[in-house]
Amino acid sequence: MLIFPAIDLKGGRCVRLYQGRMEDAIVYNDDPVSQALAWQAKGAQMIHLVDLDGAFEGEPKNLPVIQAILEAVTVAVQLGGGIRDLNIIDRYLRMGVSRVIIGTAAIKNPELLSVACKEYGQRIVLGLDARDGKVATDGWAGTSQVTALELALEMKGRGLRRVVYTDISKDGTLAGPNLAATAELARATGLKVIASGGFATIDDVKAAAALEGDGIEGAILGKSIYTGAIDVAEAIRVAREGRPC
């Protein structure tokens, strides 16, 4: 299982939110480039980057910082937030992003995901953010009537192969991830699923790794690695051990 250290960008700085609320943002580093290099030094193979301003405003808002991170690190970067059209997808991939995450646009313009998957294959990821089982949109400010499973299955039919699944109620809480729902989504769809939200201890990482056989291929770590609750290097080691025999 792969560990993804997260860097959420707001106003060019590295922040963490609580349950997706921008007003609760806490700044952890004024220099996201140095933060990305720090996670790379810890052994990360891929960094999870989110343009929070872009997610709320519907267009890229932290391009200079994103470009600087891409130029500084040698590891892969997956990026989400404000990716609503093919031109933005193409721009990010040309900049050096390894994977782009499409969230709100999958609900509002599902044909975009179809075209993107056909054009870019597995470099396209669905960002599936759920609140009480329903898909949230617009930087989590809105909630649709579509369930996470319904959207995942529809997007699979459009060529999707990978999902980042976030239980919003867990995000930034250090309350433990919703691995039951994450594993069920993976089993029900056959998609590769990256778990996100609520990771608090190394035991949470172990529990996720134990479900690798169910389709959980990665875990995104945010607040826990900024508070020191989880050490990135240890999480990577534990994740590599995979599920127990």
UniProtKB/Swiss-Prot annotation:
InterPro entries: Aldolase_TIM, His_biosynth, HisA_bact_arch, Isoase_HisA-like, Isoase_HisA-like_bact, RibuloseP-bd_barrel. GO terms for molecular function: 1-(5-phosphoribosyl)-5-[(5-phosphoribosylamino)methylideneamino]imidazole-4-carboxamide isomerase activity. It is an enzyme of class 5 (isomerase). One of its GO terms (biological process) is L-histidine biosynthetic process. The keyword Plastid does not apply. It holds the Pfam family His_biosynth. Its EC number is 5.3.1.16. It is found in: Cytoplasm. It catalyses: 1-(5-phospho-beta-D-ribosyl)-5-[(5-phospho-beta-D-ribosylamino)methylideneamino]imidazole-4-carboxamide = 5-[(5-phospho-1-deoxy-D-ribulos-1-ylimino)methylamino]-1-(5-phospho-beta-D-ribosyl)imidazole-4-carboxamide. Keywords: Amino-acid biosynthesis, Cytoplasm, Histidine biosynthesis, Isomerase. The active site is at 8 (proton acceptor), 129 (proton donor). SUPFAM superfamilies: Ribulose-phoshate binding barrel. Pathway: Amino-acid biosynthesis; L-histidine biosynthesis; L-histidine from 5-phospho-alpha-D-ribose 1-diphosphate: step 4/9. GO terms for cellular component: cytoplasm. It comes from the Bacteria. Belongs to the HisA/HisF family. HAMAP family: HisA. This is 1-(5-phosphoribosyl)-5-[(5-phosphoribosylamino)methylideneamino] imidazole-4-carboxamide isomerase. It comes from Heliobacterium modesticaldum (strain ATCC 51547 / Ice1).
